[in-house]
Amino acid sequence: MRVLGIETSCDETGIAIYDDKKGLLANQLYSQVKLHADYGGVVPELASRDHVRKTVPLIQAALKEAGLTASDIDAVAYTAGPGLVGALLVGATVGRSLAFAWTVPAIPVHHMEGHLLAPMLEDNPPDFPFVALLVSGGHTQLISVTGIGQYELLGESIDDAAGEAFDKTAKLLGLDYPGGPMLSKMASQGTAGRFVFPRPMTDRPGLDFSFSGLKTFAANTIRSNGDDEQTRADIARAFEDAVVDTLMIKCKRALESTGFKRLVMAGGVSANRTLRAKLAEMMQKRRGEVFYARPEFCTDNGAMIAYAGMVRFKAGVTADLGVTVRPRWPLAELPAA
């Protein structure tokens, strides 16, 4: 069984083909980073138009990469939400149209379920149950996962997501968009301990996050100190350490409250090397396991949508020919498979 996956929720056009016996057969990705760089962030209208230009050519490229034709595809999965409404509509419209033309089922996929299941693409996938840390530019959530669709929200950010805080702080430091990875690179040159940032909401019970205050703290620190390269690197180091420590503390609490021994982290920020190292160290001390996808599957991609589509297709999830997307879509609303 082969599923074509289409991802167009934000500023990456991702197309992939997943085979339930052979695994990933094709993976095509186009990033719009250069398109949005001059604006310092994603411009929704430009994102939608670029998806229109790139989606079909990337589908053709994926079929060629896999050595397949349209008749070899058994279902078409597409991201139905959450995300930018215009961008979502491009992928949903193309996906539904192809499914109709090819007389195969269309499968709407939740973007964050795609991220959550991305580690399943690896050679050593996690078993249920586990705690999932979903950490990206738009989401920071801790989820109890006991099966497909069996998701309980344990905690989430009450304001900025961790990835959003990374990008905003990077902008304060004069770094180009997208700033998160560039901030991490700068932080690697920083001196630990020169500046100490707070660890938000770790001084009280609960599993919620708050990162907007860190951005304000960073802005004040930047204004109060010199603008030389080393000072900026030291501030970047202090900021990254604060975010990573906060995420680690909350993950530890979530594991303690659930009693689970496995931790899965997914989403764009899960590619952060410092975060990976700290969580791996923590899980080793707890005699548990940590799982994450390879870096290219941490950010938005079609492979995770194709895989999640396969899982949902086998569970009997399909859609009619109407084009419906959900820019806001709580993960907990998904049915169990």
Swiss-Prot record:
Primary subcellular site in the record, as a coarse category: cytoplasm
The reaction(s) annotated as catalysed by this protein in its Swiss-Prot or TrEMBL entry are:
L-threonylcarbamoyladenylate + adenosine(37) in tRNA = N(6)-L-threonylcarbamoyladenosine(37) in tRNA + AMP + H(+)
Which residues of the sequence carry a binding annotation for substrate? L134, V135, S136, G137, G138, D167, G180, N272
Residue sites binding Fe cation per the record: H111, H115, D300
Q: Which cofactor does it need?
A: Fe(2+)
The kind of enzyme this is, by top-level EC class, is transferase
* Pfam families given in the database record: TsaD (PF00814)
Give the cofactor binding note. Binds 1 Fe(2+) ion per subunit.
The protein's location, in the record's own words, is:
Cytoplasm
GO terms of biological process kind: tRNA threonylcarbamoyladenosine modification
Q: Which domain of life is it from?
A: Bacteria
Q: Which UniProt keywords apply?
A: Acyltransferase, Cytoplasm, Iron, Metal-binding, Transferase, tRNA processing
Q: What is the E.C. number?
A: 2.3.1.234
- Xref: InterPro entries: ATPase_NBD, Gcp-like_dom, KAE1/TsaD, TsaD
The similarity annotation says:
Belongs to the KAE1 / TsaD family.
- Alphabetized GO MF terms: iron ion binding; N(6)-L-threonylcarbamoyladenine synthase activity
The taxonomic lineage of its organism, from the top, reads:
Bacteria, Pseudomonadati, Pseudomonadota, Gammaproteobacteria, Enterobacterales
NCBIfam families to which the protein is assigned, alphabetical = gcp_kae1, T6A_TsaD_YgjD
Name assigned to this protein: tRNA N6-adenosine threonylcarbamoyltransferase
Listed GO CC annotations:
cytoplasm
Recorded hits in CDD domains, A to Z, give:
ASKHA_NBD_TsaD-like
> What function does this protein fulfil?
Required for the formation of a threonylcarbamoyl group on adenosine at position 37 (t(6)A37) in tRNAs that read codons beginning with adenine. Is involved in the transfer of the threonylcarbamoyl moiety of threonylcarbamoyl-AMP (TC-AMP) to the N6 group of A37, together with TsaE and TsaB. TsaD likely plays a direct catalytic role in this reaction.
Would the keyword Lipoprotein turn up in this protein's UniProt record?
A: no
This chain is encoded by the gene named tsaD
